[in-house]
């Protein structure tokens, strides 16, 4: 904690106005500058593993990397990893789901209009392969299908709500799945980016459900990088940011190659 406090003397800068889709060539922050061009496997992104229906080991490895990067808000590199998973196993429905997932909005940036068509296409490919997926994967696919329209809408709010509702159904069906809890939590965060608490410290209407999902995920897997990441964000402006401190203390060591995750504990430490 001391290192972070010494390095951080001001609030983090406001997030950028837009994020480019996963197909753009800008180097992601979590990838070292000397990394070779093109897709590359990294061994410093942590040990988070989600078994998928594919029997192809390369598809599994790329899927895990994509999920780790998505939880670390490296959406471009996550998209590249999910694309490699699809190359390894074109019939992997949940790999197509991953490609669709990371093209959507997040708490820092809205979905860019150019991402609408590729996100829709990837979601529809996942849907076409749905019968090859496990029951929990099928619910994740159904949720991501609900998240997108074929063309960018004037107002994304109904789609974001439909996605959150579908993820709530997934949590109710699979409450012991930490990833599903974390994804549901993120879907709620996307309904109210950076507005989880009012100026006088009152929780926003969706915040109790958000906290419950993340705290459940942390009980299921205390080292879940996505759960810790989002819990820091969900509590940093709360009346009690200290509740995230034990989790923040572990995060950087869990994924030392994920630049965004390495800096995240400072969001909590600055509030103590």
Language-model segment annotations:
Residues 9-11:
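Bacterial signal peptide processing site
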Residues 15-26:
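Juxtamembrane proline-rich low-complexity "stalk" or linker regions positioned immediately after a signal peptide
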Residues 5-7:
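C-terminal motif of bacterial Sec signal peptides marking the signal peptidase cleavage site
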Residues 1-2:
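Sec-dependent signal peptide recognition
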Residues 28-176, 183-223, 228-251, 255-258, ...:
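Short coil/linker segments at helix-helix boundaries
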